[in-house]
Amino acid sequence: MTYLSQLEALLFVAGEEGLSLRQLASLLELTPTALQQQLDKLSQKYKEDKESGLCLIESSRTYKLVTKECLAPLLKDYAKAPINQTLSRASLEVLSIVAYKQPITRIEIDEIRGVNSSGALSKLVAFGLVQEAGKKEVIGRPNLYATTDYFLDYMGINHLEELVDISSIAVEEQETTLF
C-alpha cells in the first residue's frame, strides 16, 4: 500500500472535517516535508485526472477531499431533490443515530455504523432533517449535528421524547433471538 493511497483513504474517511498536517503526519508516520510531497502529488493527480470528480484543498490548515467546482450545478440539483424520494438505508441509519444520540459528531456516527457517513449526513442536512448544532469542545472542534423542527414535523411528533424507546426494542429483539 502506497503513502498516496493511504493518504487518499484517510482524507476520504475524514470527510468534510478533514485532517491537519500534524494528524496526517502522525497517522502515516511521515515527516512534515515528506507528507507535503505526498499531498502535492495527490493534488496534482486530481488536477490532471479529468475523469475524477475530486480535488484536494487546504482550508484553515486542514486538508480535505472535495468535489471539483465544475460539478457544483449537478450537485446542487442532486441536493435539491425532493424529500419524497425514499431515503437510503444509510441515510435512515444516520438519521436514527442523530435522533437518538444528538448532539453527535460525524466521527461518532461513523464509529457506531462502522463506515463513513459523510454522504448520508450531507443529504440529511440538504433535506433539512439534520443541522449543525455547534462544535464539540475537543481537539479539532468537530461539528455537532442534531435533528431539526422539520424532522419532528416529518416524523409527525412534537418532541423528541415521543420517539420510540429503543431500549424496549433491544430487549424484545434479544428475547426473540434466545431460542
UniProtKB/Swiss-Prot annotation:
Keyword tags: Cell cycle, Cell division, Chromosome partition, Cytoplasm
Source organism superkingdom: Bacteria
GO biological process terms on file: cell division; chromosome separation; DNA replication
Cellular localisation: Cytoplasm
First-listed, main subcellular location of the protein, grouped into a coarse class: cytoplasm
One of the record's GO cellular component terms: cytoplasm
Description of how the protein assembles with itself and partners: Homodimer. Homodimerization may be required to stabilize the binding of ScpA to the Smc head domains. Component of a cohesin-like complex composed of ScpA, ScpB and the Smc homodimer, in which ScpA and ScpB bind to the head domain of Smc. The presence of the three proteins is required for the association of the complex with DNA.
Similarity annotation: Belongs to the ScpB family.
Function of the molecule: Participates in chromosomal partition during cell division. May act via the formation of a condensin-like complex containing Smc and ScpA that pull DNA away from mid-cell into both cell halves.
Protein name: Segregation and condensation protein B
Organism of this sequence: Streptococcus equi subsp. zooepidemicus (strain MGCS10565)
Lineage of origin: Bacteria, Bacillati, Bacillota, Bacilli, Lactobacillales
Gene (name only): scpB
